[in-house]
């Protein structure tokens, strides 16, 4: 059986990257909250 996690840098960046977060209202909310909690990393 094929496993569910098939890592790919391109997919990872496009789905969870900074520009992806920045481009939607929900993503901007995520960035805002992560900045507020003082995350060392905002995105992947």
UniProtKB/Swiss-Prot annotation:
GO biological process: translation
Gene3D superfamilies, A to Z: 1.10.287.3980
Keywords for this protein: Ribonucleoprotein, Ribosomal protein
InterPro entries in alphabetical order: Ribosomal_bL34 (IPR000271), Ribosomal_bL34_CS (IPR020939)
One Gene Ontology CC term in the entry: ribosome
Basic residues bias spans: 1-16, 29-44
Protein name per the record: Large ribosomal subunit protein bL34
Molecular function in Gene Ontology: structural constituent of ribosome
Disordered: annotated segments: 1-44
Family: Belongs to the bacterial ribosomal protein bL34 family.
Listed PROSITE patterns: RIBOSOMAL_L34 (PS00784)
């Amino acid at each position: 059986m094929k496993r569910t996690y098939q890592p790919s840098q391109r997919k990872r960046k496009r789905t969870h990257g900074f520009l992806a977060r920045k481009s939607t209202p929900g993503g901007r909310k995520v960035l805002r909250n992560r900045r507020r909690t003082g995350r060392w990393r905002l995105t992947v």
